[in-house]
Regions:
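N-terminal cap/lid segment of alpha/beta-hydrolase-fold proteins
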Residues: 1-29, 278
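Alpha/beta-hydrolase-fold enzymes
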Residues: 122-202
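Catalytic active-site module of serine/aspartate enzymes centered on a nucleophile-bearing elbow/loop
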Residues: 269-301
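Catalytic nucleophile-loop/oxyanion-hole region of alpha/beta-hydrolase
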Residues: 14, 45-48, 71-106, 110, ...
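The serine-hydrolase catalytic nucleophile loop
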Residues: 42-54, 68, 252
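Short beta-strand/loop motif that positions the catalytic acidic residue
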Residues: 234, 240-242
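Conserved alpha/beta-hydrolase "acid-adjacent" motif
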Residues: 247-253
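Conserved alpha/beta-hydrolase
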Residues: 55-75
Length: 301
């Protein structure tokens, strides 16, 4: 029997669209310490985030889990566009909504992000001193380092498609899409040995739409962003969950971020990038470590 409720809410975002969110509220007395959560590159909330939010809610933490604009059930056109600026804005929109909610505790507000969302976690934590803490899980925090893992011939083909899509967008042409998760011999954004394992592990089982694609122009945004450089300005507690055998997100920059942040903490999870999720090698221990971090810092806030 669960000890929480889940409600779907929609939060206005930008001039003409909104964010589709799940709000988890524990049965304990309000106001609740709260975790604002979102997925990584191409991810939607139905793709593996519920087990984390449910575990937190079962242990007394509210959770606000949202789809970025252009993704999942949130609004925005074109579909499957990744904009770092807009995704940061979406986190801030969700945080602002949480701060206005009577059932959520302003003084115990955390942000949580997985994979590519590690970029946003460092950026936002460095600019929002009111946060009680931040968690970045199997995080990508250095775009050039991430792109450096892509073999040169494949990187050239991806870049050419991205530039063509960007120029086409300027002239009003429909977006060019790239596959997101593919096998190592195919052309796609994530072409690691475990990419298809991750795709299958995270695929929603409730019919939630999750196209395995991304607008090609999105890669140009990713390639140059380096929020690891902001780690030294983060004043809130920061937990970096870094997978020991991550083949997608470079572990060096993530480990450096934990060391540079004045209140940084590091947990090295067993296995690869997708082993932090339900069904993965270290999912249970990752839940335990993240809850301990949240509980400890919620008590001090």
């Amino acid at each position: 029997m669960t000890d929480f409720t889940r409600e779907q809410v929609r939060i206005p975002a930008g001039a003409d669209t909104d964010l589709d969110c799940w709000q988890y509220l524990p049965s304990s007395p309000a106001p609740h310490p709260t975790v604002v959560m979102a997925h990584g590159i191409g991810g939607v909330k139905a793709a593996g985030l519920a087990p984390f939010a449910e575990f937190f809610a079962d242990n007394g933490f509210a959770a606000l889990v949202f789809d970025y604009r252009h993704w999942g059930r949130s609004g925005g056109s074109p579909r499957e566009l990744l904009s770092i600026r807009r995704q940061r804005e979406d986190y801030r929109t969700a945080l602002a909504w949480a701060r206005r909610h009577d059932s959520l505790d302003n003084d115990r507000l955390f942000i949580w992000g997985t994979s590519f969302a590690g970029m946003h976690i460092l950026d936002i934590a460095a600019s929002d001193p009111a946060l009680a803490g931040a968690i970045a899980q199997c995080p990508l925090v250095d775009g050039p380092a991430g792109m450096g893992k892509v073999p040169a011939p494949r990187a050239l083909r991806l870049t050419a498609t991205a530039v063509a899509d960007l120029l086409g967008g300027v002239t009003g042409k429909p977006p060019k899409y790239l596959p997101l998760s593919v096998g190592p011999d195919s052309l796609g954004v994530i072409a690691t040995d475990d990419a298809l394992t991750g795709l299958h592990r995270l695929s929603p089982d409730d019919g939630e739409p999750w196209p395995n694609r991304i607008t090609a122009r999105s890669l140009l945004d990713i390639a140059v962003h380096r929020p690891v450089r902001a780690a030294g300005r983060i004043r809130c507690p920061l937990l970096m969950v870094v997978a020991e055998s991550d083949t997608m997100a470079p572990t060096g920059p993530a480990t450096q971020a934990a060391a540079r942040a004045p209140r940084g903490e590091l947990y090295r999870s067993r296995g690869g990038h997708y082993d932090v999720y339900a069904g993965g090698l270290d999912h249970t221990d990752v839940l335990r470590v993240e809850l301990e971090f949240l509980t400890r810092h919620a008590a001090r806030a």
